[in-house]
């Protein structure tokens, strides 16, 4: 049996990751996901913009012939995560939402120490395998002594904003055509003072 414990009210509600999904692992779990998943666009262009003061330089790489298991797609995580949770439930997983894991239950010492379950306030759940998906904020792992605290200097601040455009407007603004998708990374001094 598989139990998925979701801290948010629904899958994806607490997700802070951007909206790009790489297919190499997903394809192993759901081979026909391209036909059924809520995918927005296949990424066919990569842009990196570097800014300083009032100047910006952008590098673009375009590709069309990507091997099927090496591609990526733009997704809206709330839709995608809901779909993926439903897929897990179809395969027999039990999803519980709005439940926070407050502690990892471990046994053993030193290198033989392992996670054997989780505590959710007063409730405990034990398992042969526990997959921890707490992202960059490794609070549970740190509290259990299974990883060192994250050095703030190794972290980055990400900003995500979702806009809704008509298809034609989106393609004009981002210089795309058809079903082309774009991944765009910006960096530079425009973030000075935000930390």
Regions flagged by a language model, labelled:
Residues 15, 19-23, 41, 73, ...:
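Generic structural signal for well-ordered, non-membrane alpha-helical segments
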Residues 16, 70, 91-94:
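Short, flexible active-site loop motifs that bind/organize anionic cofactors or intermediates
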Residues 53-56, 123-124:
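Short acidic/polar mixed-charge low-complexity motifs
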Residues 11-13, 56-57, 139-140:
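Flexible loop/turn segments at secondary-structure boundaries
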Residues 1-4:
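N-terminal Rossmann-like FAD-binding beta1-loop-alpha1 element of flavoenzymes
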Residues 56-77, 117:
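Helix-loop-beta segment of a Rossmann-like dinucleotide-binding subdomain
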């Amino acid at each position: 049996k598989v139990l998925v414990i979701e801290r948010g009210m629904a899958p994806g509600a607490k997700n802070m990751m951007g909206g790009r999904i790489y297919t190499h692992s997903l394809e192993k779990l759901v081979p026909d996901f391209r036909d059924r998943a809520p995918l927005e666009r296949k990424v066919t262009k990569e842009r990196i913009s570097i800014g300083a003061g009032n100047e910006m330089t952008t590098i673009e790489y375009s590709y069309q012939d990507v091997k099927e298991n090496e591609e990526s797609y733009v997704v809206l995580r709330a839709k995608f995560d809901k779909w993926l949770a439903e897929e897990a439930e179809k395969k027999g997983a039990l999803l519980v939402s709005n439940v926070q894991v407050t502690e990892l239950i471990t046994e053993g010492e030193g290198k033989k120490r392992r996670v054997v379950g989780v505590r959710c306030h007063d409730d405990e759940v034990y398992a042969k395998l526990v997959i921890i998906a707490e992202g960059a904020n490794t609070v549970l792992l740190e509290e259990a002594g299974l990883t060192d605290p994250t050095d703030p200097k190794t972290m980055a601040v990400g900003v995500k904003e979702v806009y809704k455009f008509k298809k034609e407007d989106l393609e004009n603004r981002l210089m795309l055509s058809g079903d082309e998708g774009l991944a765009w990374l910006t960096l530079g001094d425009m973030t000075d003072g935000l930390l």
